[in-house]
């Protein structure tokens, strides 16, 4: 909205042109989302308590997690509402990439909300059935990725970018693009959901990765930087840094209340949505492989569950004391805050490695 106002008001006073600057709007979006989240946090937490939207039991975790029972959940609504308001205020609403991100955000918010609501209403940790949840996620993802494919104006928008060689860019067919893109979004959504098992464990990696993807968006939107790094130049991709800024601001604000010991949990409405947002950003920017490096912690959490289930099914033996893997370390005697901070550190290192690959071409 402010970008449009800047365009209209610049004829009255050239000073209003500042509202069109990408850096100004990114900072504005970040600060707005941060302040909204911190200001609305206590009000939402009180409302969740009044509505009895509380963690009634431990879905996945050691016995020690029973003390967390009664903590308000569905705090992801705080993140999403601040993200949406800030994005609508500061982003260029004429940019189709922004609308794809907003569509994914709203679609997965509905799925996550219903999942949380059913768990609370029926006091059943299953919520939406696995098949229905996966089907819903797939429908939303396929819709978004199909839109990206059919509105692409350049082959770079539908190409797979590999690492270490500037010539390893391959245009994808319609089917492969839609299937691969949907897999990334759905997989990312569920990976973040699995990671969200300790206080603050999922939100800071989401913030850091959002920052990393925002830098890539800015680089791809700037012709000089894109040419220097030998990555495709997508002019309208730069606008995504404003959305990433809003994501970072709302995430930091939520961490204020979600850090150990948590006053509120994000619930599936938060984790499923945040994972999908990171996934769709990676798909839009065509840097899914770089994102996979950044999201190494999320992938490790997912693989630990897959390995555990497969091993028990075929060998009747468990590889880990408990999956996802953060619970394994809990049962090994690691204090919860130490696990959280170490996973944060690993994520930061992986993001630096991932960003370094952009120069190694």
Regions found by a protein language model. Give the residues of each.
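Alpha-helical transmembrane segments within multi-pass membrane transporters and channels
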Residues: 110-117
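Alpha-helical transmembrane segments
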Residues: 2-43, 83-96, 100-110, 148-150, ...
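Juxtamembrane helix-capping/reentrant segments at transmembrane boundaries
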Residues: 57-71, 125-136, 326, 331
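Select subsegments of transmembrane alpha-helices in polytopic membrane proteins
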Residues: 68-80, 132-140, 336-346
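Membrane-interface helix-loop junction between the first two transmembrane segments
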Residues: 42-60
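Membrane interface segments of multi-pass transport proteins and intramembrane proteases
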Residues: 119-129, 160-172
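Hydrophobic alpha-helical transmembrane segments of multi-pass inner membrane proteins, especially
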Residues: 141-145
């Amino acid at each position: 909205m402010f970008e449009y106002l800047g365009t209209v008001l610049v004829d009255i006073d050239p000073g209003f042109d500042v509202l069109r600057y990408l850096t100004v709007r990114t900072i504005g979006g970040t600060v707005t989302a941060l302040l909204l989240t911190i200001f609305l946090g206590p009000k939402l937490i009180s409302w969740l308590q009044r509505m009895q939207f509380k963690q009634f039991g431990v879905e996945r975790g050691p016995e020690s997690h029973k003390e967390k029972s009664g903590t308000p959940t569905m705090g992801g609504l705080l993140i999403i509402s601040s993200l949406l308001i800030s994005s609508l205020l500061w982003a260029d609403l004429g940019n189709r990439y922004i609308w794809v991100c907003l569509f994914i955000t709203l679609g997965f918010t509905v799925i996550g909300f219903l999942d949380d609501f059913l768990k609370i209403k029926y006091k059943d940790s299953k919520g939406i059935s696995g098949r229905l949840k996966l089907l819903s996620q797939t429908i939303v993802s396929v819709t978004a990725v199909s839109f990206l494919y059919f509105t692409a104006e350049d082959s770079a928008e539908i190409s797979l970018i590999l690492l270490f060689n500037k010539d390893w860019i391959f245009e994808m067919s319609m089917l492969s693009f839609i299937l691969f893109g949907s897999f990334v979004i759905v997989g990312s959504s569920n990976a973040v959901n699995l990671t969200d098992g300790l206080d603050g464990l999922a939100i800071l990696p989401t913030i850091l990765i959002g920052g990393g993807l925002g830098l890539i968006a800015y680089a791809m939107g700037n012709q000089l930087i894109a040419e220097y790094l030998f990555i495709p130049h997508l002019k309208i991709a730069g606008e995504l840094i404003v959305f990433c800024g809003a994501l970072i601001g709302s995430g930091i604000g939520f961490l204020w209340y979600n850090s150990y010991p948590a006053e509120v949990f994000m619930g599936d409405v938060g984790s499923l949505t945040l994972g999908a947002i990171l996934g769709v950003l990676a798909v839009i920017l065509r840097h899914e492989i770089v994102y996979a490096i950044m999201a190494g912690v999320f992938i490790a959490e997912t693989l630990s569950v897959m390995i555990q289930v497969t091993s028990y099914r075929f060998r009747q033996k468990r590889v880990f004391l408990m999956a996802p893997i953060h619970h394994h370390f809990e049962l090994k005697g690691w204090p919860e805050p130490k696990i959280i901070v170490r996973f944060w550190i690993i994520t930061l290192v992986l993001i630096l490695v991932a960003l370094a690959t952009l120069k190694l071409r």
